[in-house]
Amino acid sequence: MATKRKKAQKAKDFVKPKLKVGKTAAKPDNHTDTSFTAKTISLPNQSIAKKSKSGVSEEQKQEIDLSHHLSLTKHHASATRKEVLIYIDQHLPSNPSLYKQIFTSIIPLILDQSASVRTTLVALFNKCANMQPGILELHIRSIALFIHSAMTHLHPEIRNSSTKFLNVLVEHAPQSLSKSFFVKTMRSYFTLMSWTLTDDKKSVSLAITTSAAIGGSVKKARIGHLAVLKAFLQASLFPQLSDSAESEINPAIVVSVHPQSYKYLIPAATSQAFAPLKLFANELPNNSKDIDDGKFHISDLDTITAEDLDTRRKVFVDVFQKPVVKNLNSLVKEGGEVGREANSCMTIIDNLEQELKKVAEDE
Amino acid sequence: MDESVFYIAEGDPNDKHSQESFALATSIHNSQQHASFRQADAPKNGAILSGSGQGERLIVAAPNKALLNVYSWGKESPDQRIPLPEALTCLALVEHPNTRLFSEFHRNSEFKLPSYRVPWLLAGGSKSGKIYVWELSSGSLLCVKEAHYQNVTVVKFSKCGTFLVAGSDDARCTVWKTLDLIAVFDGDNDESSRNFKPYLAITDNTLAVTDLVLNEPGVINDLKLYTVSRDNTLRIYDIITKQLLTTFILSEAIESVVADPAGRAVYVGLSNGLIRTIPLYNINPNTSVLESIGGNQKIITVESDPNLKFTFLHHQQRISADANKTSILHKNLNNKKNDTENANKPIHVTKLAISLDGTNLISGDSLGRVYVSDIVTRQVVKTFTPCNSPISQIQVSSAPFEALNVSSNSKVDKKHRLIPQLKRVLTGRDATEHQLNLEIPSESRDESDENFAVWLSRKTQEDLEFKNLSGVNSSVKKVANITSDSESKKELEDKLAKLSSAYTQLRSKHEELLKEHSKVLNNKA
């Protein structure tokens, strides 16, 4: 008997368990249940309120706090990103050496998907520029890069808010912006407004198809675009008599051996004053043939350094004026708010024409 | 063109064979790394780069060893190890005034740079206070001078090569005429030629002179010397008149100094991690007169700067450095005591340099960090790979993009790259034995696209230059004769008549007005 039972048991070990489709397999004998339930999961890295460590000085604590918040600017939730920007806005440090970190983390948010983040960012840029004069000039290369990218972005909402950032630059760093990025900004404007530089069929049809995709919100945004365009043209095509920063030297009252001596002082608010000269930029050579008729052409646009006022005026007159005037005229005909803004842009261009005429007469 | 920053550190004293030390040359304006040098460490100011680009050299005095390591640009390991009579603590190079002019004029135009080129003189200061001067193209030792009583901390040539300035731990600073130092071949009797005095010996400081800079003026009369010392002072001297111009007193010991290329400001690195801007010109807020600060032996106490308008703070931060340094491995190797010791040590700003256009300041500190910061906003623009020990030298030089990137085909073989062995005994007085081999560079002008007319015009220019005895270069331009046909003649006559009548009219009007004017004046009187 005993042997029979043993035999049966032994045989059982070698029987293959039958698996049935649609039924979960039986757990093995040595299975341990490791599942657990929890009401909340906390991810301390991703929370805004962070417990500060004890035993560090107040200054260091602030710094740790700031770097923690800066890492949160890449947080997946747009609400958190916005909260973080507001926090930074309220806790901007007085130590200038921390601003590099801040700017490298917040500049990419120009292309943020969420509108509320972008509006908060505009306010933050404004505050930074007020706290540290010259800071926007210092980072203008990357800021302008992202703004141009925003102006030509696929997402219409990002395009719409792009000129708000441009407006910050026009207000706080007009000189550096127009010296280094006049041509690029003008070109981006053409894409933004879906205007064309040339009249050939291909580009016109492209512009029409893109303008067909323009919805109601985009039409409204054009008012803002035109207002900024007006400010931008005013800043870059006319001499700037007084600089915004109050620390700048007032030439009228300075007494010196030579009346221009003050120009050789270290500037108080213009950082990287020589950057627009592109002394140290390694640029690709231009392959297009030169047409030497004393005018700029569209093919030249990539290589022009519009550092001085005269070049900017010449580039504008030679290349941009005709298509800009044409498109503005059609906007004026539309009437309404857009028409009014377009009209005020036109007055700027008229002013320029008159001034150029006067210069020509004087000569 | 690109600007390259070279930096080197003092080396970890525990690392006997300097396996972990390296020196780098990196661009300021982009992220490119131009060159790196392995096993390179030097005492403060003990490394010197002759320039950036192919064919240039790095000369490094090995710390506490009577040895000089020579690297070529583009090669990582040392090319040569040259034994010396004594361990050197600081080095300086100077170009020959004639070849410097030559290379400046012809750098881009007519002649190529020679592929083998060495600077003219190498000067070194030693721990015992001696100054050594070698001629690099022959390797002969021209001078050994007992200049100081203690370790020489810095030697520098003026850009024109006229003066050599040395600073030392014995709180003195000496200025030497280069011609006195190398006058081995002239003197007939030993005594007078060997026992020359310094051009100027400065004994104003009370503690060690840590660094000095000379400005680069167009005329030598403007040559100024800026010295800094552990006794908290920055002093400005006029070398030609041997006058102390200004003394600035700061709140901390000063470790390093650099001057604005246009002489508008001086930047000093302090022993508490701050960099202070000391403006040399300002606009007086009361009278709004643009005036220079100091001069006339004034003593100026630099006030503390609560608004941080003249202070760079970034070297004081310790957190970022710890993040770089304290990898887990590092923590395990070093015991905790060492770490806390490090944390309590104040951070010195050990070296400073300035970019070509005077808008960027490059600074290195005792933790081995190197930053580029914008001068106007005092912000860090760039952070370089940190070294493991205090930064001992920073140099900025600019060169075209092509020169900086070493291509493999243009490499010179080792035999033609090496500099001659530096001699350990003074050279003989026999000037006839002094022989030099120099490469005469080929003309870089492209002969193919030159036509006969261009050649002819060049020859006439050369002819003119040859015949010209005065300093003025002028040539007479012949204007082709106008064929005097009657028509043009008449036209010209008409014009003349018109002009003369207009002139007489104007003249009479002017006289009339003048009369009126004098009448009015008389009436008033």
From Swiss-Prot, chain A:
The keyword rRNA processing applies. The keyword Nucleus applies. InterPro entries: ARM-like (IPR011989), ARM-type_fold (IPR016024), Ipi1_N (IPR024679). Its main location: nucleus. It is found in: Nucleus. GO terms for molecular function: chromatin binding. Residues 1-38 are annotated as: Disordered. Keywords: Nucleus, Ribosome biogenesis, rRNA processing. GO terms for cellular component: cytosol; nucleoplasm; rixosome complex. GO terms for biological process: maturation of LSU-rRNA from tricistronic rRNA transcript (SSU-rRNA, 5.8S rRNA, LSU-rRNA); pre-replicative complex assembly involved in nuclear cell cycle DNA replication; regulation of DNA-templated DNA replication initiation; ribosomal large subunit assembly. Component of the RIX1 complex required for processing of ITS2 sequences from 35S pre-rRNA. Belongs to the IPI1/TEX10 family. Component of the RIX1 complex, composed of IPI1, RIX1/IPI2 and IPI3 in a 1:2:2 stoichiometry. The complex interacts (via RIX1) with MDN1 (via its hexameric AAA ATPase ring) and the pre-60S ribosome particles. This is Pre-rRNA-processing protein IPI1. It comes from Scheffersomyces stipitis (strain ATCC 58785 / CBS 6054 / NBRC 10063 / NRRL Y-11545). The lineage of its organism: Eukaryota, Fungi, Dikarya, Ascomycota, Saccharomycotina. The gene is IPI1.
From Swiss-Prot, chain B:
One of its GO terms (biological process) is rRNA processing. Signal peptide: none annotated. Keywords: Nucleus, Repeat, Ribosome biogenesis, rRNA processing, WD repeat. This is Pre-rRNA-processing protein IPI3. SUPFAM superfamilies: WD40 repeat-like. Component of the RIX1 complex, composed of IPI1, RIX1/IPI2 and IPI3 in a 1:2:2 stoichiometry. The complex interacts (via RIX1) with MDN1 (via its hexameric AAA ATPase ring) and the pre-60S ribosome particles. GO terms for cellular component: nuclear pre-replicative complex; rixosome complex. The gene is IPI3. Its main location: nucleus. Belongs to the WD repeat IPI3/WDR18 family. The keyword Nucleus applies. It is found in: Nucleus. WD repeats lie at residues 105-144, 147-186, 204-247, 326-374.
